[in-house]
């Protein structure tokens, strides 16, 4: 049982690789109460929004898309991005506690689910491992977008699961009429969690200024039983206590705490038909890893953004926009020493620079869209603090150059969209790295990756159509081909990974991964009763996964040896949602269900697949009060890979 209480004062209106997964039946109940105070009332409580990844409004996006904003976002706001969107259709979350919950979309995670902040890469290392947190604070986000299909191709070619874009208002595009602000506070009973966030916006002449901050502190969360479940490696360790073979903690889960804070500042010069803005963000996040090995991660990031947009720059075009971001990310991984407590073990650094040019054209023969270019340069480094040697994978520089083009059209009751993206990706490892000896049992040791540069040419495209066969009723069909290059970790890993209890081995011979996704949906978008049903079939060529060889690494506390491999695979699934008066004044309800099944074409189940689930949400909004409750039931996952433990 989990209860969340929110208090808000709105002063003005605001527009793995190699993870062994143990699955079980899960039931979650959430209750929240909110009081909302507005400086001025509005006859329409629902803000009109538009996805930045689409030219059309929310109800007309062809592929299943969700945009969280306003009160709905505030009520679902969690400690992490995964916790915030974890009950949306087709979206679950990784299981590394309060601090490192990353979205899992339709059975896919890691590099197959791209995370953006204001349309540019977050610049963290969360795609490498599920214990690495997403470095994009959500407390002061204006909206969170979940995109698929052609809209997703605008930002990346490898998002076969989907794309999540966290949008904030640090770079304002219009001058505030007056100084405005907002404060949000919450309390969680399950972790004695206390959170607060605030934002202030004002203008001086033609300059708009934005300041936001947030703090979130959560203790180890309460559990209804014991910390040990069936499965291997059952030792739980916490600082200050000696290692034991099977310490069975009750009442609270060790190393499940989370403490984070962030500060963001932005300024914009607003002209008659353009704006130019900059912003800076500092983020700190210290969180425990609730695995049997224990440990914690101290994470920080400095991020700098620049945007310039000119409206109606020349005939036939509605806007030209240039965006850039620099992120300097690092985190320190701490292992548990029985004598000294948390001891620094590894330091991860990632420096990322990204540039985008986006040119949007006006409607032509029913079509409206944009095209542009994107350039990304990143440098990843992981080092063992005690020895100065590499940790898990050698230092690697990744270069990506892309061209994209998306179009959306409307002709009466028919709509269509098209997307095309070409990406050239290169992975360049440190070629003088000396790999460690895992001491595999039984011998021989797994082959070490070749430290050679790899280049990949990727072509992704999408087409979809929607027929509005009656007022408020529509049915759509879309087809997306998405190609992604293997990540640096999948190519070059060769080392110990404490949190997943594995010795990870990359495969430098991996080819590009290609997904072919066919999707059908039917939806009702008007009236008090609304709903949607989505069904999809996603077939993969060269699906990359971590295979457990059955060996153990003597140099890594007898952790399991996991090697990157490729195979043909298929993921199929369905999602359904039915709502009554949802996000409106009065009483409302939302009923949802989703399920996916992943298999190797040669036989056997894909690893790391989420369990089927059903959920119910109830809400009542009256005057300035809002109360809601949600209940989610996850079934037992019995379709496991041969090496997974249930």
Which positions does each model-derived feature cover?
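Short acidic/polar hinge/loop motifs at secondary-structure boundaries
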Residues: 121-150
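Short, acidic, small-residue-rich periplasmic hinge/interaction motif at the N-terminus
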Residues: 39-74, 82, 110
């Amino acid at each position: 049982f989990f209860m969340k209480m929110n208090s808000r004062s709105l002063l003005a209106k605001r527009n793995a690789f190699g993870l062994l997964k143990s699955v079980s039946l899960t039931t979650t109940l959430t209750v929240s109460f909110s009081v909302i105070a507005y400086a001025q009332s509005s006859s329409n409580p629902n803000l009109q929004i538009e996805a930045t990844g689409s030219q059309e409004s929310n109800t007309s996006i062809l592929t299943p898309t969700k945009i969280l904003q306003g009160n709905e976002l505030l009520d679902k706001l969690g400690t992490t991005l995964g916790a915030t969107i974890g009950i949306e259709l087709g979206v679950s979350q990784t299981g590394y506690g309060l601090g490192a919950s990353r979205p899992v979309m339709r059975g896919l995670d890691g590099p197959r689910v791209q995370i953006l902040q204001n349309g540019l890469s977050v610049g963290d290392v969360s795609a490498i491992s599920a214990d690495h947190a997403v470095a994009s604070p959500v407390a002061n986000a204006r909206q969170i977008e979940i995109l698929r299909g052609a809209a997703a191709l605008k930002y990346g070619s490898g998002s076969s699961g989907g794309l999540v874009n966290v949008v904030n208002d640090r770079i304002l595009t219009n001058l505030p009429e007056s100084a405005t602000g907002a404060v949000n506070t919450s309390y969680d009973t399950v972790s004695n969690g206390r959170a607060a966030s605030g934002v202030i916006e004002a203008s001086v002449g033609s300059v708009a200024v934005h300041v936001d901050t947030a703090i979130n502190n959560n203790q180890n969360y309460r559990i209804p039983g014991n910390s040990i479940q069936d499965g291997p490696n059952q030792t739980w360790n916490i600082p200050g206590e000696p290692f034991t073979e099977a310490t069975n903690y009750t009442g609270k889960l060790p190393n499940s705490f989370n403490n984070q804070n962030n500060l963001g500042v932005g300024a914009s010069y607003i002209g008659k038909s353009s704006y130019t803005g900059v912003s800076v963000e500092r983020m700190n996040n210290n969180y425990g890893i609730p695995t049997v090995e224990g440990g914690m991660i101290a994470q920080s990031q400095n991020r700098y953004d620049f945007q310039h947009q000119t409206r109606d720059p020349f005939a036939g075009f509605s806007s030209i926009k240039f965006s850039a971001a620099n992120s300097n990310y690092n985190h320190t991984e701490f292992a548990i020493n029985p004598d000294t407590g948390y001891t620094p073990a590894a330091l991860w650094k990632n420096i990322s620079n990204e540039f985008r040019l986006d040119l949007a054209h006006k409607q032509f023969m029913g079509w409206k869209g944009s095209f542009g270019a994107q350039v990304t340069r990143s440098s990843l480094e992981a080092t063992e603090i005690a020895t100065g040697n590499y940790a898990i994978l050698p230092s690697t520089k990744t270069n990506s150059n892309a061209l994209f083009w998306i179009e959306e059209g409307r002709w009466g009751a028919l709509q269509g969209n098209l997307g095309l993206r070409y990406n050239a990706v290169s992975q360049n490892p440190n070629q003088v790295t000396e790999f460690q000896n895992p001491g595999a049992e039984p011998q021989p040791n797994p082959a070490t990756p070749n430290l050679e540069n790899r280049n990949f040419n990727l072509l992704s495209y999408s087409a979809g159509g929607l027929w509005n066969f009656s007022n408020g009723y529509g049915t759509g069909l879309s087809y997306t081909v998405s190609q992604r290059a293997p990540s640096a970790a999948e190519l070059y890993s060769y080392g110990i990974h404490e949190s997943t209890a594995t010795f990870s081995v990359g495969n430098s011979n991996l080819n590009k991964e290609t997904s072919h996704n066919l999707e059908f949906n039917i939806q009702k978008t008007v009236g008090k009763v609304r709903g949607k049903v989505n069904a999809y079939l996603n077939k993969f060529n060269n699906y990359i996964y971590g295979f457990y060889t059955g060996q153990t690494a003597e140099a890594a506390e007898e952790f399991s040896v996991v090697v990157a491999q490729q195979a043909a695979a298929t993921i199929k699934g369905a999602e359904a949602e039915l709502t009554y008066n949802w996000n409106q004044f009065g009483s409302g309800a939302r009923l949802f269900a989703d399920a996916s099944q992943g298999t190797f074409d040669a036989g056997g189940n894909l690893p790391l697949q989420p369990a089927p689930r059903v959920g119910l949400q109830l809400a009542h909004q009256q005057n300035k009060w809002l109360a809601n409750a949600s209940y989610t039931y996850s079934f037992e996952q019995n379709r496991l890979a041969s090496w997974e433990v249930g």
